[in-house]
Design a protein with these regions (language model features):
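Histidine- and acidic-residue-rich, metal-dependent catalytic cores
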Residues: 1-132
Length: 132
């Protein structure tokens, strides 16, 4: 992802987020080791994408054939357990306290994922057509 983003000037600003989103919140785990997410000016964005990526990967029942999808509530408990070490504690607190966000994320991760993926795909196809 980082290499792709660096090849397109319109997306270059997102490169640090793509590069650092596999690092833990406290910076002790993940990759690449050479990237210090704790000192990045994009830390909040990195932390948000880290949570989103983990949530997506853990609940994905379509394309992750190397594991079974977990229910949203199980993943939410894992986020809670990793609060402050693996995950940004403030962001986890929002996930735990905002009922509307909880309901939206539960629906997005457990229902209708196929249509969501297709809509995102069409958005990118149309964006690319406009740029040509």
């Amino acid at each position: 992802g980082s290499d792709y983003l660096s090849s397109d000037p319109d997306f270059l600003i997102y490169q640090p987020v793509a590069l650092g989103h596999h690092r833990s919140y406290d910076g002790t785990r993940g990759y690449p080791l050479s990237f210090d997410n704790t000192a990045s000016p994009y830390r909040d964005a990195i932390d948000l994408i880290h949570i989103c990526d983990c949530l997506d990967a853990a609940t994905d029942y379509l394309s992750r054939n190397y594991h079974r999808a977990k229910p949203f509530d199980v993943v939410l408990n894992e986020l809670k357990a990793g609060r402050g070490t693996e995950y940004n504690p403030d962001m986890v607190d929002v996930l735990l306290s905002d009922r509307e966000l909880y309901n939206d994320l539960k629906m997005l991760t457990e229902q209708n994922r196929e249509n969501i993926y297709y809509d995102i795909y069409l958005t990118f196809v149309n964006l690319r057509k406009k740029r040509q």
